[in-house]
């Protein structure tokens, strides 16, 4: 029971942070959004930990992984990587990853948390709403795959992201993303 109470408390904290992040409204600009994520980065890192939350572990991660089918030959772009826990999951499967987030603080936390995978994961700060920023992640080879877990719905303008992913992926590359279904959105107004 104690674990359940702790989990419920954490869910309340998570909901409060999410409300703060999402509660600004649809007209929230990238800089305003970035500021809120910077302020909440440590909370999210603590809440997601090394293995993410239960919903992600039990529902999202298995399906995304099934669709992505990571293997040691893969060179994967992890979009809006947060604290890097999915990047490390991919690294454990032998893949090489370039992971980015627009929160500098979140990337610092990811580098610290996932330091044992430093040879396989390159963490970068980049803005998913800025095509040029994303294209700067291009290295000496094209990505075999791209992935985004539960982030697309929080990106204010996805067209630059989609254009950049298209350019960065090899011709046979795939882009797998998970997003929140509208029926799970909490109405705040």
Regions found by a protein language model. Give the residues of each.
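A short glycine-rich, Lys/Arg-flanked "PGG" loop and its adjoining helix->strand segment in the class I
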Residues: 159-174
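Class I SAM-dependent methyltransferase SAM/SAH-binding core
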Residues: 75-79, 83-133
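Conserved class I S-adenosyl-L-methionine
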Residues: 18-71, 85, 89, 109, 174-189, ...
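A short acidic, Gly/Pro-enriched loop at the edge of an enzyme's catalytic core
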Residues: 134-146
């Amino acid at each position: 029971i104690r674990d359940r109470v702790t989990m419920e408390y954490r869910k309340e904290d998570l909901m409060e942070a999410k409300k703060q992040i999402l509660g600004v409204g649809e007209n929230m600009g990238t800089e305003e959004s970035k500021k809120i994520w910077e302020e909440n980065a440590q909370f999210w890192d603590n809440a997601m930990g090394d293995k993410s939350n239960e919903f992600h572990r039990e529902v999202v991660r298995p399906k995304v992984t099934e669709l992505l089918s990571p293997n040691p030959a893969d060179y994967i772009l992890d979009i809006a990587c947060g604290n890097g826990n999915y990047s490390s999951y991919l690294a454990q499967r032998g893949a090489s990853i370039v992971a980015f987030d627009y929160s500098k603080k979140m990337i610092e936390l990811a580098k610290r948390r996932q330091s044992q995978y430093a040879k396989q994961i390159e963490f970068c700060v980049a803005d998913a709403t800025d095509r040029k920023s994303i294209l700067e992640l291009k290295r000496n080879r094209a990505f075999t795959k791209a992935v985004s877990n539960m982030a697309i719905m929080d990106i204010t303008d996805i067209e630059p992201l989609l254009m950049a992913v298209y350019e960065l992926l090899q011709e046979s590359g795939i882009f797998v993303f998970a997003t929140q279904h509208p029926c799970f959105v909490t109405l705040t107004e």
